[in-house]
Regions:
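Conserved AdoMet/S-adenosylmethionine-binding subsite of the radical SAM
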Residues: 227-408
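Short beta-strand motif preference
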Residues: 80, 92, 188-192, 301
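Auxiliary Fe-S-binding modules of radical SAM enzymes
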Residues: 1-127, 151, 155-167, 331-339, ...
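Hydrophobic alpha-helical membrane-insertion segments
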Residues: 120, 136-141, 149
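Conserved Radical SAM active-site core
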Residues: 99-122, 145, 153, 157-298, ...
Length: 442
């Protein structure tokens, strides 16, 4: 079987020409794959029945990943086990965000930072605090939060006086703003995998324990997005969807397929690259190539240490490309208006979370258009690190802010179902003990 999903318009045009078809047939297939997000050839009803039959007879299928299982977190996060055609599996995460009623003021800054937390205690405290923070910051699907902020009155009309949707949609049918708005959400983020496993071997990450099995194709990368959007009935153009290439794998070690998937998502599915962020552990040739791209997501560099000595211990890739080389390459990326480079920093108790480290980070990032996302380490079996104290997290953040760096503490999402940062590892055989697991396919 050969997958159509993942082919560009030029490739589809060549395929149709080989079957004696005119170029407009390729456009019809393209529209079916990426705009309509069909699951089978039978759904591409703009194609003649005989042509659909010929494609099927010659081994062509749509080829979306199969959503084999899902686990649902208490905070609304969903983690999916995606099975590829050869049986390999990766994980993809869906994270819906609330209407901004508590912290959002309607500004772009509030929108961009809606996924972050305000306090160190919430980030460190574990699943219980994770749940309560999520319930406080996120609207529940299809339910009122007690104030009616941004919700529907049953007939679709926006009601309430505090939330984003009640401000934007007052007196109007909230369904006009998309599926997410109808469910009381402001936006959603999909976390995508780029490889089966990972070769980088970050010592604090569960995915590293898998090793690397293979790269994903562009169709398998973009196909994760299509499968998740279909599950939730998302309407591109109405619903606000953000994509983060932060799942299993190192995107810049699968650079060509990663960038092809970006083009498919932008040109085919209509998701702007400004709504995408790619995270890299620091693959220097990839960063250099990325700087030359005309269509590219935002960049997030996993810094995670303030000096090469500590970074080599927790991220052995540093022995190949040190911090200075990475920062030099990052500074050559032409930034758009209101764009910055994000530096991710996983806080490990007693390893990289002390004031001396914060001072070193400030020195590294001095003069850069930078934002720092602090990520409290998410525990995993067999990994001998521990979380920092809330006091150390708060001091670290405060020092960076005082030094002029916009610094946020990421709100952990899906920690209870191993869906949080650094926890994507589990397989079908390991899932029996995870609460909330639902089998949705074979």
């Amino acid at each position: 079987m050969s997958a159509l999903f993942g082919m560009g318009l030029g490739e589809l045009t060549e395929l149709m020409a080989g079957l004696g078809q005119k170029p407009y047939r390729a456009r019809q297939v393209w529209e079916g794959l990426y705009k309509q997000r069909v699951g089978s050839l039978e759904e591409v009803t703009t194609l003649p029945v005989l042509l659909r039959a010929e494609l099927a007879a010659t081994g062509w299928v749509v080829g979306l990943p199969v959503m084999a299982q899902t686990a649902v977190s208490v905070d609304g996060t969903e983690r999916y086990l995606m099975r590829m055609a050869d049986g390999e599996t990766v994980e993809t995460v869906w994270m819906p965000d609330g209407d901004g009623g508590e912290r959002g003021d309607g500004s772009e800054a509030a929108v961009e930072e809606a996924g972050e937390v305000e306090t160190a205690e919430e980030a460190v405290a574990g699943v219980e605090a994770d749940s309560s923070a999520a319930l406080r910051n996120d609207s529940q699907k299809g339910k009122s939060n007690g104030n009616g902020e941004g919700k529907s009155n049953g007939g679709g009309e926006a009601v309430g006086d505090g939330g984003y949707w009640s401000r934007r949609g007052a007196g109007r049918d909230i369904r006009n703003f998309g599926t997410l708005a109808e469910k009381g959400f402001r936006r959603a983020t999909i976390c995508i995998s780029s490889q089966v496993g990972c070769a980088v071997n970050c010592q604090f990450c569960l995915t590293a324990k898998l090793g690397i099995r293979r790269n994903l194709t562009a169709g398998e990368i973009a196909g994760q997005v299509a499968a998740v959007l279909n599950r939730h009935g998302i309407q591109i153009g109405k619903d606000r969807i953000n994509l983060v290439f932060m799942g299993m794998g190192e995107p810049f070690l699968n650079y060509d397929e990663f960038m092809k998937s970006v083009r498919l998502l932008v040109e085919g599915m209509g998701i702007p690259e400004s709504r995408m962020t790619v995270s890299t552990s620091g693959i220097l040739p990839g960063i250099e190539a990325f700087a030359k791209e005309t269509v590219r997501p935002k960049l997030a560099l996993s810094l995670n240490a303030s000096n090469d000595g500590v970074r080599e211990e927790i991220m052995p890739i540093t022995r190949k490309w040190n911090i200075a080389a990475l920062l030099e390459a990052v500074q050559k990326i032409p930034l758009r208006n209101r764009e910055w480079v994000t530096f991710e920093y996983v806080l490990l108790g007693g390893v990289n979370d002390q004031p001396v480290h914060a001072r070193e980070v400030l020195a590294l990032l001095a003069g850069m258009r930078a934002k720092v996302n602090l990520i409290v380490w998410n525990p995993g079996p067999g990994i001998a690190y521990h979380q920092p104290t809330p006091e150390d997290v708060a001091v670290f953040q405060g020092m960076l802010i005082e030094g002029g760096i916009a610094t946020y503490i990421r709100r952990p999402r899906g920690r209870d179902i191993y869906a949080a940062c650094g926890q994507l590892k589990r397989t079908v055989a390991e899932e029996s003990g995870v609460q909330g697991l639902v089998a949705i396919g074979v």
